[in-house]
Curated annotation (Swiss-Prot):
Keywords assigned: Cytoplasm, Disulfide bond, FAD, Flavoprotein, NADP, Oxidoreductase, Redox-active center
Keyword Flavoprotein: yes
Protein name, per record: Thioredoxin reductase
Family stated for the protein in its record: Belongs to the class-II pyridine nucleotide-disulfide oxidoreductase family.
UniProt enzyme class: oxidoreductase
Molecular function via GO: thioredoxin-disulfide reductase (NADPH) activity
Residues spanning the membrane: none
Record's miscellaneous remark: The active site is a redox-active disulfide bond.
Organism ancestry: Bacteria, Pseudomonadati, Spirochaetota, Spirochaetia, Spirochaetales
Catalysed reaction equations from the record: [thioredoxin]-dithiol + NADP(+) = [thioredoxin]-disulfide + NADPH + H(+)
Amino acid sequence: MLEFETIDINLTKKKNLSQKEVDFIEDVIIVGSGPAGLTAGIYSVMSNYKAAILEGPEPGGQLTTTTEVYNYPGFKNGISGRNLMLNMREQVVNLGAKTFPETVFSIKRKGNIFYLYTENYIYKSKAVIIAVGSKPKKLETLKNSGLFWNKGISVCAICDGHLFKGKRVAVIGGGNTALSESIYLSKLVDKVYLIVRKNNLRAIAMLRDSVAKLPNIEILYNSEAIEVDGKSSVSSVKIFNKKDNVVYELEVSAVFMAVGYKPNTEFLKGFLDLDEEGFIVTKDVVKTSVDGVFSCGDVSNKLYAQAITAAAEGFIASVELGNFLK
């Protein structure tokens, strides 16, 4: 099975003035390598289009940090997010798509050709599919969280959970991500406090049932984390219970934020129409404000952030690509 290549790229780095322009023009370049981008690649090459995938700083996308995916068709016992994405990548490569470990910093159109600028190269194509996904939001209202970033404040349990074995931690959120993170952490830590702003969980029933069976996960409903404290690292979090109108403190060694996602569209400002939250504005599901540029997955679909909907939109983008290139 193919493995993802580890990429160390500073996303704030300015464009390299000595970039080399590649000497080939693709029919389509797909920016991003999550379920949307890889599915778009699969269908594009199956339609005999020359396709290249610029994988970005996180090959495989957010799913590679998900322990188990239970709601993707075809896997009766679930599959790890990483293995699901490795399977997709192997499939698209076997079909003939090119993959490059590159991050796009800007896109320009000159005539009928799109120029995609990365750190080292300028790629060229007749059309572009944007599938860069989104990244976990930081909870800006949590006081002192910036002081303890990577010192007990995290947005990725699978990345950082091992640092807190045998300790007490908190997870903020009530959706699928928050419950998945809590379940994963429950296998490592002594206690998980799941801090839920509302009086119910938004996650799917399977995850809710799994959490209910785990004795070391305690759900705190109608609650907000308002402040973290500590010396060199997190040692406590203050909780405001809205129902009882009381503030109290929990001793924890880490706080994991699972409160939604922000689209990775900073490099598209001024090139495509974005909404007030930064998501790509689309019509007919995948068409953007620029002819020949299509968008699919979480970067434009903020209502249904699921692997299956991202993959479906990747297919739709490949169909619209065909209509554009005719």
